[in-house]
């Protein structure tokens, strides 16, 4: 009798439904809203940097960092999210480069190389971003020995 009960328990356990499918966070409303927020911060920080307001640009970059982290924490972030994150890192790298912090700047540009080198599918836009990041690294490397 115990064997029959054990067998029934195994069969019933095996028939249970599997784990529920994971929700795709990129389809949640917060995800799209966060991309819009980060892209807006990117533009504001870029404009501040171009206007010579480095402190304001730096504050905006800090404000965008948690948004970037949240967007990239999902299993498969969208192209738009990665582009917004890339723009933030590129701007920060350029700011560091302009302040002669070549090693730190190189690190931020290297993050973009890693992003775009491994992005699939490759598009003209992602290839252009990869080329831009590699050029920025070359610029850093020219100055590191100074």
Describe these PLM feature segments:
Residues 16-29:
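Bacterial Sec signal peptide processing site at the extreme N-terminus
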């Amino acid at each position: 009798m115990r064997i029959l009960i054990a067998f029934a328990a195994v069969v019933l356990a095996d028939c249970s439904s599997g784990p529920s499918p994971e929700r795709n966070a990129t389809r949640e409303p917060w995800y799209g809203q966060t991309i819009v927020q980060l892209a807006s911060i990117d533009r504001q920080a870029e404009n501040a940097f171009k206007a010579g307001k480095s402190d304001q640009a730096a504050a905006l970059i800090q404000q965008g960092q948690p948004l970037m982290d949240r967007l990239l924490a999902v299993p498969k972030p969208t192209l738009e999210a990665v582009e917004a994150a890339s723009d933030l890192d590129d701007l920060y790298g350029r700011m560091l480069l302009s302040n002669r912090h070549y090693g730190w700047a190189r690190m931020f540009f290297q993050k973009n190389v890693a992003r775009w080198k491994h992005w699939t599918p490759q598009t003209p836009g992602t290839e252009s971003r990869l080329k831009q990041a590699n050029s920025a690294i070359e610029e850093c490397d020219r100055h590191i020995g100074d």
